[in-house]
């Protein structure tokens, strides 16, 4: 069921490709923002090449609504509307012209408000001020780091996560959390399940703190999603497979497994042999 819209686009393209071979297929360079909130419409801008009008869009998230607002040669503007009940996590969007489809564009359904990374945030002195509830669309800067700063109250717990694998980025992130004196409170690198960084910190002292995000191999231009919030730090869900049409309790393993709320889910029988995500909170 979830792939029917895309297959219909491919079928149409196969019928028309021979007559349109001189037109380049769409190629995507960037998407801003890279995350969309449930229960809202997000205006998304995609840049690249070969965006000939008319252009079609498709997604593997069957409950998402995509509306093309404007098409230019190197930019497509669209509105992405997600229902309140959408599962949090990555999903794909495809653009298709008469010449063929683009590679999939990975977008995150995220309940944290999206913010774009500011230009020039390459030092503590020029760090970008962000909220403790935010999802930042970022890009690695080679030998330089991206610096952010947050203000916290006494005994506030804040969770941090740099997402790369889910958005199919090749970045290998390293994160440093620092206090006003430059002391490193946390140095986060790979965890047990991959290169993404996830940790939480309980701030005993109120004030301003700084976070640096950089690529471990000093490569520039690699995408990442920097999430700051009050979410649990988890590694996996269990069981990993459920029976469609039956209610199942989903538990979680990881640092905050004892605090994470067990989720009861039931997928329709038509959802058999599909993959999805399950979100939880403390």
Give each language-model segment a name.
Residues 1-3:
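N-terminal secretory signal peptides that target proteins for export/translocation
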Residues 90-94, 104-107:
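Hydrophobic or amphipathic alpha-helical targeting/insertion segments
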Residues 105-132:
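Predominantly extracellular/luminal regions of secreted and cell-surface proteins
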Residues 85-89:
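Solvent-exposed loop/turn motifs of extracellular immunoglobulin-like beta-sandwich domains
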Residues 25-75, 84, 98, 138-282:
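Acidic, Ser/Thr/Pro-rich low-complexity intrinsically disordered segments
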Residues 7-18:
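Bacterial N-terminal signal peptides
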Residues 5-8, 162:
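Generic detector of N-terminal low-structure segments
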């Amino acid at each position: 069921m979830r792939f029917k819209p895309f297959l219909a686009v491919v079928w149409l393209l196969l019928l028309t490709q021979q007559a349109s071979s001189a037109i380049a297929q769409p190629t995507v360079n960037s998407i801003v923002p890279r995350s969309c909130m449930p229960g809202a419409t997000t205006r998304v801008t995609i840049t690249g090449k070969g965006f000939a009008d008319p252009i079609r869009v498709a997604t593997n998230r069957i409950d998402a609504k995509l509306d093309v607002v404007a098409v230019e040669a190197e930019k497509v503007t669209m509105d992405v509307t997600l229902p309140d009940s959408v599962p949090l996590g990555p999903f794909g969007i495809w653009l298709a012209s008469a010449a063929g489809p683009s590679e999939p564009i990975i977008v995150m359904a995220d309940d944290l408000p999206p913010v774009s990374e500011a230009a020039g945030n390459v030092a503590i002195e020029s760090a970008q001020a962000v909220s403790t509830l935010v999802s930042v669309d970022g890009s690695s800067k080679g030998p330089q780091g991206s610096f952010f700063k947050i203000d916290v109250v006494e005994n506030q717990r804040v969770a941090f996560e740099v997402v790369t694998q889910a958005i199919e980025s090749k970045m290998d992130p390293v994160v440093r959390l620092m206090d006003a004196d430059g002391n490193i409170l946390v140095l986060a690198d790979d965890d047990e399940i991959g290169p993404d960084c996830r940790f939480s910190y309980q701030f005993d002292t109120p004030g301003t703190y700084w976070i640096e995000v950089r690529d471990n191999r000093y490569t520039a231009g690699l995408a990442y999603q920097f999430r700051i919030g009050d979410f649990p730090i988890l590694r996996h869900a269990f069981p990993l497979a459920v029976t469609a049409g039956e209610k199942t309790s989903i538990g979680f393993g990881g640092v905050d497994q004892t605090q994470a709320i067990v989720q009861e889910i039931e997928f329709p029988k038509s959802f058999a042999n599909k993959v999805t995500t399950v979100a939880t909170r403390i």
